[in-house]
């Protein structure tokens, strides 16, 4: 395995471990999720360039669109929780149910 793929995979694993360790705060979880999406985007972009398959070049762009949507929804939840309760704990998400 080339070193660049190993580094990107290591970045994904470190972000996953960060998500598991800091799951009580929403902001930390969102940052770790963004790190995971960035490493997946980089890995998909490198793989699509190396495969020389023209249809696979749209996959990283679709992943980037989903990452932007995930960030927007996450930040909206973070703002709503922090305005309502003043904290960014994930435990407060259960209180937002109707």
Swiss-Prot record:
- The primary site where this protein sits is mitochondrion
Membrane topology summary: Multi-pass membrane protein
What do the Gene Ontology cellular component annotations say? mitochondrial inner membrane; respiratory chain complex I
| UniProt keyword list | Electron transport, Extinct organism protein, Membrane, Mitochondrion, Mitochondrion inner membrane, NAD, Respiratory chain, Translocase, Transmembrane, Transmembrane helix, Transport, Ubiquinone
Q: Which reaction does it catalyse?
A: a ubiquinone + NADH + 5 H(+)(in) = a ubiquinol + NAD(+) + 4 H(+)(out)
**InterPro entries recorded for this chain?**
NADH_UbQ_OxRdtase_chain4L/K (IPR001133), NUOK/Mnh_C1-like (IPR039428)
Which leading EC class covers this enzyme?
Answer: translocase
Superkingdom per UniProt = Eukaryota
Family of this protein:
Belongs to the complex I subunit 4L family.
Which species is this record about? Mammuthus primigenius
Record-listed E.C. numbers: 7.1.1.2
The keyword Cell cycle is assigned to this record = no
Per the entry, what this protein does is:
Core subunit of the mitochondrial membrane respiratory chain NADH dehydrogenase (Complex I) which catalyzes electron transfer from NADH through the respiratory chain, using ubiquinone as an electron acceptor. Part of the enzyme membrane arm which is embedded in the lipid bilayer and involved in proton translocation.
Q: How does this polypeptide assemble, per the annotation?
A: Core subunit of respiratory chain NADH dehydrogenase (Complex I) which is composed of 45 different subunits.
Q: Where would you find this protein in the cell?
A: Mitochondrion inner membrane
Q: Pfam family of this protein, just one? A: Oxidored_q2
**Which GO molecular function annotations are given, in alphabetical order?**
NADH dehydrogenase (ubiquinone) activity
Per its record, how is this protein called by name? NADH-ubiquinone oxidoreductase chain 4L
- Which GO biological process categories is it annotated with? ATP synthesis coupled electron transport
Annotated transmembrane regions: 1-21, 29-49, 61-81
């Amino acid at each position: 395995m080339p070193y660049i793929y190993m580094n990107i995979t290591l970045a994904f694993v470190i972000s996953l471990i960060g998500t598991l360790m800091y799951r009580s705060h929403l902001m930390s979880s969102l940052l770790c999720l963004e790190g995971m999406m960035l490493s997946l985007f980089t890995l998909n972009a490198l793989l699509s360039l190396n495969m020389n398959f023209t249809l696979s070049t749209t996959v990283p762009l679709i992943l980037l669109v989903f990452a932007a949507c995930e960030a927007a929804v996450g930040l909206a939840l973070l703002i709503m929780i922090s305005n309502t309760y003043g904290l960014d704990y994930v435990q407060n998400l259960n209180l937002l149910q109707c």
